[in-house]
């Protein structure tokens, strides 16, 4: 039975931290599905279609190189429902620090109660990407700063275009 993993997130924007998680995740599964969350209460910088396209462009080559099947989807329901929809039994979550662990453990516990067949796997961030957050990247970009150390080149270009003023 193939190991199918779902890596959910808003990916607004895709960061080098997300890329780091994908590099680890493709070694853990036979098929990785990146799920771009669409939340009605949030106003993302990039549309769901833009985030999906960036995620596919950045992550798919990593999966292909690792011999891991790959797909990107959007979802607007519970993460465990999205996992069931695509046949995933593994949820991949990245951890930067203890604060992330505390938060993610709560979510993992709730998810396990709702879907005992879906298991959360935590991937610790590599040291070089631990300080990166999409929130900080957005703040730097909106203020005209250089985000290239924190995001893939494609994303840096898209952010420059988005916030060119």
Swiss-Prot record:
The metabolic or biological pathway listed in the UniProt record of this protein is: Cofactor biosynthesis; coenzyme A biosynthesis; CoA from (R)-pantothenate: step 4/5
Q: Which cofactor does it need?
A: Mg(2+)
Task: List site positions: Transition state stabilizer.
Answer: 18
Which keywords does this chain's UniProt record carry? ATP-binding, Coenzyme A biosynthesis, Cytoplasm, Magnesium, Nucleotide-binding, Nucleotidyltransferase, Transferase
Q: Where in the cell is it found?
A: Cytoplasm
Main EC class the enzyme belongs to: transferase
Where along the chain is substrate bound? 10, 42, 79, 93
Gene Ontology MF annotations = ATP binding; pantetheine-phosphate adenylyltransferase activity
What is the reaction catalyzed?
Answer: (R)-4'-phosphopantetheine + ATP + H(+) = 3'-dephospho-CoA + diphosphate
List the record's Gene Ontology CC terms alphabetically.
cytoplasm
- Residue ranges annotated as transmembrane are none
One GO process term, biological-process aspect: coenzyme A biosynthetic process
Residues that bind ATP = 10-11, 18, 94-96, 104, 129-135
Pfam families for the chain: CTP_transf_like (PF01467)
**What EC number(s) would the UniProt record show?**
2.7.7.3
What family does the entry list?
Answer: Belongs to the bacterial CoaD family.
Question: What is annotated about its quaternary structure and interactions?
Answer: Homohexamer.
Q: HAMAP family this protein is in? A: PPAT_bact (MF_00151)
Sum up the protein's function in the record's words. Reversibly transfers an adenylyl group from ATP to 4'-phosphopantetheine, yielding dephospho-CoA (dPCoA) and pyrophosphate.
Q: In its UniProt entry, what is this protein called?
A: Phosphopantetheine adenylyltransferase
Organism of origin is Nitrobacter winogradskyi (strain ATCC 25391 / DSM 10237 / CIP 104748 / NCIMB 11846 / Nb-255)
């Amino acid at each position: 039975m193939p190991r199918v993993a779902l890596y959910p997130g808003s990916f607004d924007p895709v960061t080098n931290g997300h890329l780091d998680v994908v590099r680890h995740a493709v070694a853990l599964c036979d098929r990785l599905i990146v799920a771009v969350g669409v939340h009605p209460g949030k106003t993302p910088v990039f549309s769901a279609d833009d985030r999906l396209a960036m995620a596919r462009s950045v992550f798919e080559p990593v999966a292909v190189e690792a011999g891991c099947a790959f797909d990107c989807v959007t979802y607007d329901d519970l993460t465990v429902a999205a996992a069931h929809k695509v046949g995933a039994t593994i949820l991949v979550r990245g951890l930067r620090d203890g604060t992330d662990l505390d938060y993610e453990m709560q979510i993992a516990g709730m998810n396990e109660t709702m879907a005992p067949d879906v298991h959360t796997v935590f991937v610790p961030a590599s040291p070089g990407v631990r300080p990166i957050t999409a929130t900080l990247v957005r703040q730097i970009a909106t203020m005209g700063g250089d985000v290239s150390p924190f995001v893939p080149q494609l994303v840096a270009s898209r952010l420059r275009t988005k916030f060119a003023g």
